[in-house]
A protein has these predicted regions:
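Acidic, Ser/Thr/Pro
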Residues: 1-205
Length: 205
């Protein structure tokens, strides 16, 4: 005889919207913040993190996307631009992107773990595509459009990082897939206001 189903209780916590400010009320941080940055749209920010510290990236309004890079500080000081490598990560984790649990780490091209995923309230990201580039917009007819790769180039100059036409970033909250016809599809992000990814740094970054 088949086992009867067990009861399942579902709790839904909706995001709170402040009518006065016309903004969503963000959840409390999981830890006392050492550093807090609000990254405005079409911009990039840099910050430094020590091994063992946490990085919480929050989608403040829902259905927003964010490109993420992380460099090994020690290697960068030695003139080696070692950052998260999506191909190495997919190879070692055996999945499209890491998730909390056993297969949770992002690796660099030297096969060293850089960060690990501790918590992820969305579970849908992209590691196959560049951060948006000038060519991406030019192909659509938008010449000179602000793009993520050039934003990265601008803010990384102070670390003497060489500019690139396209960055192999971790594209957080992007909803991409490869369909049965081998076509890359892009759809609306699944993230809601207040959704986040929590990383732990495995190196000084």
């Amino acid at each position: 005889e088949q086992n009867p189903p067990t009861d399942l209780t579902v709790f839904l916590n909706k995001s709170k919207f402040d009518e006065k400010s016309e903004q969503y009320v963000l959840p409390e941080p999981l830890y006392d913040p050492i550093n807090e940055k609000f990254v405005k749209r079409r911009t990039a920010e840099t910050y430094e993190v020590k091994a063992g510290e946490y990085i919480q990236i929050i989608d403040t309004s829902g259905r927003q996307c964010s490109d993420f890079l992380a460099f090994d500080s020690r290697k960068l000081n030695d003139g080696i631009e070692s950052l998260i490598d999506p191909t190495a990560t997919r190879t070692f984790m055996g999945s499209a992107y890491p998730m909390p649990g056993l297969f949770s780490k992002f690796f660099d091209a030297q096969h060293d773990p850089v960060i690990e995923v501790i918590r992820d309230t969305v579970g849908r990201h992209d590691t196959f595509n560049y951060a948006c580039t000038a060519k991406y917009y030019e192909d659509m007819g938008y010449m000179g459009h602000i793009n993520c790769s050039e934003n990265f180039n601008n803010v990384l100059k102070k670390y003497d990082v060489n500019s690139r036409k396209g960055w192999t970033a971790i594209n957080l909250f992007f909803n991409t897939a490869i369909d049965a016809n081998n076509v890359a599809s892009f759809d609306e992000p699944w993230s809601r206001p207040g959704d986040y990814v929590l990383f732990r740094a495995l190196k000084d970054l």
